Amino acid sequence: EPAWIESGFPLSLSLPFRQEPFDEETTRAFFDNLLPEQGIRAKVSKLIQISEKNVYGFLETIGGECAGALTILADGDKPQSKPAYEKISTQKLGELVSLLPRRPLLAGQDGVRLSLAGAQNKIPITYLDDQFFFPANGSPSTHIIKPSIDDLPETVENEAFCMVLAKTAGMNVPEVKILDTYPSAYMVKRYDRVIEPLSIKRIHQEDFCQAMGLPVAQKYQNEGGPGTKQCFDLLAHCENPENDRASLLT
């Protein structure tokens, strides 16, 4: 769209502005990296009855609230004019967390369109004024809830402790809080959301694989993914490369 090229922003370093459309192979890596991985994707696939390899079908179904500033809609659908939220209790939040092993991202439930990358169970939630709200139909969230990893029951405490320790050491890390839920879970504030007086603003972001145009299968260095040098080189595109490279090291 010419208007978007004039006033918008590129979705990715790997998808710079240009008049000609990109082919499917070039765009696939960016969108595939918005989706969950491994066993989580396999379970979601069964719940929504869409093939694991059908990236765009997945996003059409669950891509309402993704990482960054994107909301993926089916052709012809329009964004919500007003976000919708359901206030929930801590007990109800625990019930939602307990569903995740069987229903990752709560996929397949009416009004639920959530997608987060990674191989661990998690769900986005909105937390305002010490109250929890469930974001319906892809409304923006503010935090991410992470339960313990299967067979590793103390990961909640371990991950939260490491985050607090990093913050105490002066590192720039999001706020975390262990929740009084059963099963146990902790909450981390989203760095790609800004809470404004009357709204929640999405901040666009991408990971290294998206910025380099690499598929999910090449996320890890031992599987052909980027190493430290490639990541350092990529940060030359940032406004302040030296600071960002220092942050990467820590």
Regions found by a protein language model. Name each.
Residues 1-250:
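Phosphate/dinucleotide-binding and metal-coordinating scaffold of catalytic cores
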